């Protein structure tokens, strides 16, 4: 598995060589940030520059090509002003799931009010509902179902925050805090993540009913 501390040190060094004082923020998201990484986990980097042009995207891409584990690198690249004007419901998850390496995202906090949390839950539930119905009727894909449960686990994090005021990053800890309906979602996600067998119809029906409930909340 990647030594993420050494890897991010090298990433920051290389990024600084390429973009210098234009760097506003660098962070780590995903399983490496949560301490839940496996051999196949992505390295989910967040980079916010003063601004981003097409040339910057090309330059960043060329920089990534020089780094080890290139095939595992993913993440988010943006200009500062775009981020500060981003949809607040997206920023709720973004802020709370990002581990700072350089700089701070605290300027986003003013945008993360109760309405943003409620909207994150609503939009997430609507997207899961649509994805679930579409998959049950057309693709009938176990891989899509796994992705929908992953998305649902993020919605559960927002629900937990709404109900308790706590943002819980680690899914196993989340499982101990949330209500029974949400426990089913998180438990199923963890089972699927660890390679558990898929009961397509039952899992789809459970996810459909759960998302339906939260759309109407």
Task: Walk through the language-model features, giving the residues of each.
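Catalytic core of pol beta-like nucleotidyltransferases
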Residues: 1-17, 21, 33-39, 50-217
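Short, glycine- and small/hydrophobic-rich beta-strand elements in well-ordered beta-sheets
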Residues: 21-29
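N-terminal loops that bind phosphate or other acidic moieties
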Residues: 42-44
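Short hydrophobic/aromatic beta-strand micro-patches
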Residues: 46-48
């Amino acid at each position: 598995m990647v030594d993420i501390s050494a890897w991010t040190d090298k990433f920051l060094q290389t990024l600084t060589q390429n973009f210098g004082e234009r760097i506003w923020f660098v962070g780590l998201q995903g399983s490496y940030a949560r301490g839940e990484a496996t051999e196949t986990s992505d390295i989910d980097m967040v980079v916010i520059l003063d601004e981003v042009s097409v040339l910057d995207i090309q330059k960043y891409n060329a920089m990534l090509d020089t780094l080890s584990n290139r095939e595992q690198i993913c993440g988010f690249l943006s200009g500062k002003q775009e981020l500060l004007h981003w949809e607040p419901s997206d920023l709720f998850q973004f802020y709370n799931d990002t581990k700072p390496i350089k700089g701070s995202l605290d300027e986003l906090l003013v945008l993360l009010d109760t309405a943003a949390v409620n909207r994150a839950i609503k939009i997430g539930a609507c997207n899961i509902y649509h994805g679930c119905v579409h998959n049950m009727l057309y693709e009938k894909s176990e891989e899509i179902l796994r992705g929908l449960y992953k998305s649902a686990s993020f919605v559960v994090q927002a629900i937990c925050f709404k109900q308790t005021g706590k943002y819980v990053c680690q899914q196993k800890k989340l499982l101990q805090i949330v209500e029974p309906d949400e426990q089913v979602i998180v438990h199923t996600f963890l089972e699927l993540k660890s390679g558990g067998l898929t009961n397509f119809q039952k899992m789809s029906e459970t996810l459909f009913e759960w998302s339906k409930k939260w759309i109407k909340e």
